[in-house]
Amino acid sequence: MRVRKRQSRRTSTKLKEGIKKKASAHRKKEKKMAKKDVTWRSRSKKDPGIPSNFPYKAKILEEIEAKKMKDLEERELAKQQRLEARKAAKEQGVDAMDEDMIEDDENGLAALVESAQQAAAEYEGTPSNDADVRDDELDVIDYNIDFYGEDVEGESELEKSRKAYDKIFKSVIDASDVILYVLDARDPESTRSRKVEEAVLQSQGKRLILILNKVDLIPPHVLEQWLNYLKSSFPTIPLRASSGAVNGTSFNRKLSQTTTASALLESLKTYSNNSNLKRSIVVGVIGYPNVGKSSVINALLARRGGQSKACPVGNEAGVTTSLREIKIDNKLKILDSPGICFPSENKKRSKVEHEAELALLNALPAKHIVDPYPAVLMLVKRLAKSDEMTESFKKLYEIPPIPANDADTFTKHFLIHVARKRGRLGKGGIPNLASAGLSVLNDWRDGKILGWVLPNTSAAASQQDKQNLSTINTGTKQAPIAANESTIVSEWSKEFDLDGLFSSLDKAIDASKDQDTMME
């Protein structure tokens, strides 16, 4: 049998080009017809809806309808408030737009005024009235001291911080005349260590002031409770070291960065002028990592809204790695220090619980958090204690109805929801709960999640505070302190002239409470 030769598939160029032209003309015609078609086609996928056999369908539909009605009421209420505010401003002769922009442009306008004053002084050849040094002439000294020693393989970040505690803290205490202990306003008690207070009281001639930072993240009534609680032990000053919360919800707007930082700086200068020292006093700043120590120093260095950044800052713990001394003027120096995880006073807590609490205090960088789930679970339990925090939390993450009887089950379903919404998925579309947990902790660190802790005003807690302040554990016996806490607060307040500052801050807090009440 003769095998036939395979027929060639070669075609002429004329035939090939003809096919191409016909195909192109066909596609062009189809595209033109599609444009003329009036039928609307959405590119987004259609919502499949709720299955009819789903047992909670009726309940979910009711909740969706209730949410729509609630959102509509909120929009109408906000519109009515805007109209009333515009009407009131018009009656007073003030433009509503200008009234809203006053606070936002406060720092920028102050900086422009100061720049104009300095330029005029240079042009006229007259010296400036400000005795302080300029921002670009700040005298900054870095002390490169090895606080952590040699790296040990397998040593955790918490163990390194414990090792550096004695060296860093002792260096700051010995070099400082005044200690600014920075606390996180959302949870001051957890960022506070009684051993630090005892060590300062044991050092003769040292003064301790509690700085309640991040006051823009808590409501005025919570701030007022914490101030009353902390003022019974030491002088406490609220401070807003950063420009504002990134979540758009900011409390205590009357306590601006310029107002609080200027008041604190004036108090330090008053103490410096009243002290009989022939040298400049040194103000040491201590606290947990990421509570805002460097931001406090930068706020103090700001000249009427200036943008001095003598200390590097960041939203993650561990930015400051060495002692840094900044000279403000001839009578005042500030000493910045790395964050310290102070030794825990509760020995009954497990290592996992302690690390979860540190993660919730933003004291651990994200790369050192092994398992974020315990910290997220602790956060969920904290937010569940208040309806205001719970509603804000659900609104932020758009949490659907989750059938859960306990916090553990709810947290797992919540992390699955966050992982799917933010694309934190692993192989095969499996939700990555660890990545979702870190994302939630980052939102908490950045202030996107509204949350706070109320002070424990029980009799047992008050008695424990008095006992801690009235005695110092020296290792062998209890050494009494000469003055009680009320005497300490009154005497130190006079030295820093804090009475006028406290009265002005109380008025600002009351004004913030009235403003929040009107917005509600």
Swiss-Prot record:
Record Pfam families: GN3L_Grn1 (PF08701), MMR_HSR1 (PF01926)
Compartments in which it is found: Nucleus
Keyword set, alphabetical order: GTP-binding, Nucleotide-binding, Nucleus, Phosphoprotein, Protein transport, Ribosome biogenesis, Transport
Residues that coordinate or bind GTP: 213-216, 287-294, 336-339
GO cellular component: nucleolus; nucleus; preribosome, large subunit precursor
Domain CP-type G: 165-343
Main location as per UniProt: nucleus
GO terms classed as biological process: maturation of LSU-rRNA from tricistronic rRNA transcript (SSU-rRNA, 5.8S rRNA, LSU-rRNA); protein transport; ribosomal large subunit export from nucleus
Compositionally biased intervals (Basic residues): 1-13, 21-34
Residues where Phosphoserine is found: S337
Domain of life: Eukaryota
Gene3D superfamilies: 1.10.1580.10, P-loop containing nucleotide triphosphate hydrolases
Molecular function as annotated in GO: GTP binding; GTPase activity; mRNA binding; RNA binding
Chain positions covered by the region annotation Disordered: 1-53
Biased composition (Basic and acidic residues): 35-48
Biological role stated in the UniProt entry: GTPase required for 60S ribosomal subunit export to the cytoplasm.
Domain description: In contrast to other GTP-binding proteins, this family is characterized by a circular permutation of the GTPase motifs described by a G4-G1-G3 pattern.
Further comment: Present with 7130 molecules/cell in log phase SD medium.
The family this protein is said to belong to: Belongs to the TRAFAC class YlqF/YawG GTPase family.
The protein's name: Nuclear GTP-binding protein NUG1
Gene (UniProt): NUG1
